[in-house]
């Protein structure tokens, strides 16, 4: 294969059978359980990279069920998102994500910079409540519950919240182990069709784990819980800050 052919075909690895396809990346009936809790503000400031700024000592703990996604298939995800500001723009910084499907792990890390790791999350209705769990290996590290559809939320407001900016720290090493890419990336959810939004009483339990340290941001108080169902497109990203260029 000629170098020009390599350049024209190069998108993702392996070259002859990429781990994930080109987009657009559309999700149908994507289901969220988002439990917002208050945590230790000092710990937040230690882990959120500047120029992002922590605005409140809050964390959104998310369980997401994605049964129909373009190119990625059927999978579930769980992780922590921290409310932040960038140049006065409010958004969310994704700290870590745990999921059970290789294509979105590879695509998420290589394309956007999502901090994804392999684990075993679940999200389903358990009789009268919605239940989210996260197992890392044989250890249960997160359990979230919310009363099932106790109260409807405003669809327009929840659509607006979901459409806000999201931030990622994309890191790709060079072959010698030094940083080749170290960038702050911004992306948006697009073409959102909110099909339902509810709230109810909620609980969240996090357990310590060396390699899935969700409990490093302890739950001090549950602030809010939301159960959302939406169709949406995961938009591609843009680099807003290059750490290696500074």
UniProtKB/Swiss-Prot annotation:
Enzymatic reactions: acetoacetate + H(+) = acetone + CO2
Coiled-coil parts of chain: none
E.C. code: 4.1.1.4
InterPro entries (UniProt xref): Acetoacetate_decarboxylase, Acetoacetate_decarboxylase_bac, ADC_dom_sf
Molecular-function GO term, any one: acetoacetate decarboxylase activity
Keyword entries, A-Z: Decarboxylase, Lyase, Schiff base
Protein name (Swiss-Prot/TrEMBL): Acetoacetate decarboxylase
Lineage, top ranks: Bacteria, Pseudomonadati, Pseudomonadota, Betaproteobacteria, Burkholderiales
């Amino acid at each position: 294969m000629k170098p020009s052919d390599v350049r024209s075909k190069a998108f993702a690895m392996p070259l002859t059978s990429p781990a994930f396809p080109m987009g657009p990346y559309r999700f149908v009936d994507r289901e969220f359980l988002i439990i917002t809790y208050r945590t230790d503000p000092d710990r937040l400031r230690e882990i959120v990279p500047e120029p992002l700024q922590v605005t409140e000592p809050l964390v959104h703990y998310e369980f997401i069920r994605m049964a129909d996604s373009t190119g990625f298939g059927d999978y579930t995800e769980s992780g922590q998102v921290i409310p932040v500001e960038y140049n006065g723009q409010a958004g969310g910084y994704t700290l870590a994500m745990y999921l059970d499907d290789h294509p979105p792990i590879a695509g998420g890390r290589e394309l956007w910079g999502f901090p994804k790791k392999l684990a075993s999350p679940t999200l389903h209705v358990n009789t009268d409540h919605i239940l989210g769990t996260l197992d890392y290996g044989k250890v249960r590290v997160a359990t979230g519950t919310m009363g099932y559809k106790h109260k409807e939320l405003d669809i327009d407001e929840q659509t607006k919240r979901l459409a806000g900016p999201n931030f990622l720290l994309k890191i790709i090493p060079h072959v010698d182990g030094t940083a080749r890419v170290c960038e702050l990336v911004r992306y948006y959810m697009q073409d959102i069709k909110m099909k339902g939004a509810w709230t109810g009483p909620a609980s969240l339990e996090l357990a310590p784990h060396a390699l899935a340290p969700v409990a490093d941001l302890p739950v001090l108080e549950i602030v809010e819980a939301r159960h959302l169902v939406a169709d949406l497109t995961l938009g591609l990203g843009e680099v807003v800050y290059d750490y290696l260029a500074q």
